[in-house]
Structures are given as C-alpha cells and as structure tokens.
Design a protein with these regions (language model features):
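Signature of N-terminal electron-transfer/Fe-S-associated modules in redox systems
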Residues: 1-150
Length: 150
C-alpha cells in the first residue's frame, strides 16, 4: 500500500483524530496488517502520538502488526463447538495449510486463528473464512470449502 492510498483513506475521514480506529480498520482491511510506516503516516496526518496508535493496534485483536494471509480463517473453540468437533476442523486445516492456530503460511495465503465464540453455538462446529460463517462443518466439508479460497 503506497502513501497516496493511505492519504486517501485518511482524507475520506477528514483527517479527524476521532476516526483513528476507522482509519486503521480500513487500512487493515486492504493491507491485512499494519506496517510501521503506515502507523507513522497515520500518526503524522491525524496528529495522534505513535505510542497511542501502537497501543490501540496491540490492544484489539482485529489489528495485526505482522503480515497476515489473504484469507483469514477462524475456528470457534467455544464450548458448543469444542464438544461438536472443532479440534477435528483445526487438525484438518493444519494438515491442508501447513500452519497451526496463530500462524500465517509463508506465501501469505492463509492465516489461521481460534476464537472463543462467534455467537452461532447451534451451528457448531463453526468456521469463518474472510468473514463468512460456515456451520456444522465436517473435516470433509472443510477440505471442499478451502478449495474455494486459493
């Protein structure tokens, strides 16, 4: 992401310091992570101390300071999903992608995370890919679903 695009996003929010989180979310949505040069530019343009921006970026799980994959996969490991086989879904994803929960593959294709609950307990086990929820997922369905996210 070039500096001009970052400026466009900031300008869209009128360079208003109160829009900091929205600006960060929009950049994160396009870049999939927040490199230091991005944080520095946002700090300068919004007149918000870099330390405050770094605090926000490390406090909220929505933000990442390390590169993430193009496809973000979340597997619910809450109680309902756990008892319905979430660990088998995680094992299948690890086998298919070569990464464990909390990791991103070297090609920056996939990032795999666990979440405590996505609020769809009746549909467990639940997997989310790029914000789309899939319920009652089996290991076989996991294989088929992942084929759609190359």
């Amino acid at each position: 992401m070039d500096k001009a695009r970052i400026d466009q996003i900031i300008d869209k929010h009128n360079a208003d310091p109160s829009s900091l989180i929205q600006v960060m979310l929009e950049i994160q949505g396009e870049k999939h992570w927040l490199p230091k040069y991005v944080l520095e530019q946002v700090s300068e343009r919004l007149q918000v101390p870099l330390t405050r921006i770094q605090h926000i970026a490390t406090f909220y799980k929505a933000f990442s300071l390390v590169p993430k994959g193009r496809h973000e996969i979340n597997v619910c490991v809450g109680t309902a999903c756990h008892v319905r086989g979430a660990s088998r879904i995680l094992d299948t994803l690890t086998e298919l992608t070569g990464i464990k929960a909390g990791e991103t593959d070297l090609e920056l294709k996939y990032s795999l995370e666990t979440v405590n609950c996505v609020g769809c307990c009746a549909l467990g086990p639940v997997m989310e890919i790029d914000g789309k929820i899939f319920g009652n997922v089996t290991p076989t369905e996991t294989i088929d679903l992942l084929k759609n996210y190359k």
